[in-house]
Curated annotation (Swiss-Prot):
Organism in which the protein naturally occurs: Fusarium cerealis
Further facts: Trichothecenes are sesquiterpenoid toxins that act by inhibiting protein biosynthesis.
Biological process according to GO: sesquiterpenoid biosynthetic process
Entry function: TS is a member of the terpene cyclase group of enzymes. It catalyzes the isomerization and cyclization of farnesyl pyro-phosphate to form trichodiene, the first cyclic intermediate in the biosynthetic pathway for trichothecenes. It serves to branch trichothecene biosynthesis from the isoprenoid pathway.
Gene label: TRI5
GO molecular function annotation: trichodiene synthase activity
Pathway in which the depicted protein is active: Sesquiterpene biosynthesis; trichothecene biosynthesis
InterPro entries associated with the record: Isoprenoid_synthase_dom_sf, TRI5_ascomyc, Trichodiene_synth
UniProt keyword annotations, A-Z: Lyase
Assigned protein family: Belongs to the trichodiene synthase family.
Catalysed reactions listed for this entry: (2E,6E)-farnesyl diphosphate = trichodiene + diphosphate
UniProt entry tagged with the keyword Lyase: yes
EC number: 4.2.3.6
Superkingdom as given in the UniProt entry: Eukaryota
Protein name, UniProt field: Trichodiene synthase
Length: 375
């Protein structure tokens, strides 16, 4: 990857981590593994069900990788919610990642979307049918305002993925398009609203803080993800419709200029996030800070983002940014580098296979009439 701007990436990452005062102390190692396994186990059993297996039609290895990635994201970032809430959110966000990786045209299955919704019929699109079935398990954790945000943001996400099917980065001069698409498919409001379960927060009492958090999180969360994803997406053909690449097309600027634009906006958002909530409800600030730090840890430690490659490349360099980045990376790894073998078991495919064999045995049992049962 000769053209990747490594030095610039190091400087940007270091500034971000310094701005949020990164210091992930969300869990002990034992607590982290316990929560990871609990959320994974419930989610794995969910996706091993015959209905999910039949309707999703996802390659088993891809589903396994998606589930492990999402469980890590939720457990590391939603550190204050219950284990049950973590598990239900893990299922929901795994559905979104599965859709994000899909290449199916949604148009045919969406022709009667509203008519089916209004009539209470099952959606023709299999993803919507499954997500709607699971939604009550998610929404039971939240009040009506937060729930509305989760529903609406999920609908926006579906639309954003639909747009991405066209592999369209925007027309030159359409300056609003990149942020429009990123807000649409970023799940920012869903994430921002799902930090406030009703067993921990009264959404009426904390309405102003929650509303502001949803507004601020929309940009912060997706922009940090875009920065941390920049390395893995740089030469990946599947990831060419990214915010940075769309900036290049629509604003008619260079890649370096686009990255600088994203960097400045992310750093400004990080400053705002810390400053706005510094003097607000301490529980609210603690929740936001734990999310921010856990979210960064997840990016640094999850193999999906390949940031260990950057670490290996620069760990012997003597520049200030390289040394700072490596220190932050090692700090994250000390708390967040947990092998999947310690918590992501059994595999979904194994669970699905066991269920399938069980269903076959059940179907092969001899039928006994009521008279035979009495005899």
């Amino acid at each position: 990857m000769e053209n990747f701007p490594t030095e610039y990436f190091l400087n940007t990452s270091v500034r971000l981590l310094e701005y949020i005062r990164y210091r992930d102390s969300n869990y002990t190692r034992e607590e982290r593994i316990e929560n990871l396994h609990y959320a994974y186990n419930k989610a794995a059993h969910h996706f091993a069900q015959p209905r999910q297996q039949k309707m999703l039609k996802v390659d088993p290895k891809r589903l396994q990788a998606s589930l492990q990635t999402i469980v890590g994201m939720v457990v590391y970032s939603w550190a204050k919610v219950s284990k049950e809430c973590m598990a239900d959110l893990s299922i929901h966000y795994t559905y979104t990642l599965v859709l994000d990786d899909s290449s199916d045209d949604p148009h045919p299955a969406m022709v009667n979307y509203f008519d089916d919704l209004q009539a209470g019929r099952e959606q023709a699109h299999p993803w919507w049918a499954l997500v709607n079935e699971h939604f009550p398990n998610v929404l039971r954790h939240f009040g009506p305002f937060c729930s509305l945000n989760l529903i609406r943001s999920t609908m926006d996400f579906f639309e954003g993925c639909w747009i991405e099917q066209y592999n369209f980065g925007g027309f030159p001069g359409s300056d609003d398009y990149p942020q429009f698409l990123r807000r649409m498919n970023g799940l920012g409001h869903c994430v921002g609203a799902s930090l406030w379960p009703k067993d921990l927060f009264d959404e009426r009492k904390n309405f102003l803080e929650i509303t502001t958090a949803v507004a601020q999180m929309e940009n912060w969360m997706v922009w940090v993800n875009d920065l941390m994803s920049f390395y893995k997406e740089f030469d990946d053909e599947r990831d060419q419709i990214s915010l940075v690449k769309n900036f290049v097309t629509c604003h008619e600027i260079t890649l370096d200029e686009a990255l600088e634009k994203l960097t400045q906006e992310t750093l400004h958002s990080s400053k705002q996030m810390v400053a706005v909530f510094a003097d607000k409800d301490p529980q609210v600030m603690d929740t936001i800070e734990c999310f921010m730090h856990g979210y960064v840890t997840w990016h640094l430690c999850d193999a999906r983002y390949r940031l260990h490659e950057i670490y290996e490349k620069v760990k012997d360099q003597d520049t200030e940014d390289a040394k700072k980045f490596c220190k932050f990376f090692e700090q994250a790894a000390n708390v967040g580098a947990v092998a999947a073998s310690e918590w992501a078991y059994p595999p979904v495919a194994q669970l699905a296979n066991v269920r399938a064999k069980s269903d076959v045995k059940e179907a092969q049992k001899p039928f006994l009439s009521s008279i035979e049962l009495v005899e």
